[in-house]
């Protein structure tokens, strides 16, 4: 199992996203207003807990996993998101040696 998969397995996307987005359940999924663009009329941001992904069907038309969510929300690159999410998940990152 890769480090990325281990982190994804330890962090529930609902826990992460619900820290900054108010979500309501709609069947198996959750819906709310996208945190990445102004919109207060039509909730177009959907979290799919079964696949650990999210998608905005509105203005930004983007989606991804927990890494992409944190990268977009914080303006970070993958390396920064990896370190923060690894710490949150309790996963120790070991440097790759050539």
List each model region and its residues:
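N-terminal structured subdomain of primase-like DNA metabolism proteins
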Residues: 1-98
